[in-house]
Amino acid sequence: MKLYSYSHCPFCARVKYVAGKLGIKLDDVVLDYDDTETPTKLIGKKMVPILEMDDGTVMSESNEIISLFIELAGSSESNKPTQGAIEWQGGSFAPLLQIGLPRWPLLDLKEFKTESSRIAWEDNKQSIELNFVNLIASTPEIVLQVNGFLIGTEKQLNINNGKTSLSLLDSAIYFSILRGLYCEPTITWPEQLNQWMNYQALESHVPLLR
């Protein structure tokens, strides 16, 4: 099976995380961010992740792809997230975007290798509220908010020696979003949460974004 993805994308990371934890092998194809032709040919629009199966059929919803992986692995894991994970996710995107949007194109990520892809990113993602220059200038204030958010997250996950009782899908949700915050080195990670994140990265073979 072939997965078309971006390295920075939390929904792509979620799919890769589940595949890695279940031992499902994927041919991961990271698209250039300004490549509209490939995804449009596959699903009619520019969106990832896209799973292309061996028989040529495609899937483009991360939840559906994850459900397929759970089924293929014969796993008893639930394909539904808990309400707690859903609510946490709803409050997580603001800090993630404030940190990630101006920084991810500066990392050594395949989707941003070309100047045209970085320009396309800025054109698509920058707004009055999320102005990249202003976000970088506001780093100290944003980091303070993120630090508090991470403390609350660690308490919610009830981590013990780097492990939790989370389901596979809930773990995928938390991990896929939190990994995107590692691109800002001044963020202070609570010890147990940082230990859990690094352990999950090793187990799933999905690296943290730094």
Listing of model-derived features with the role each one plays in the protein:
Residues 1-122, 159-161:
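GST-like domain detector, emphasizing the conserved glutathione-binding G-site
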Residues 74-83, 124-135, 206-210:
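Short secondary-structure transition/capping segments
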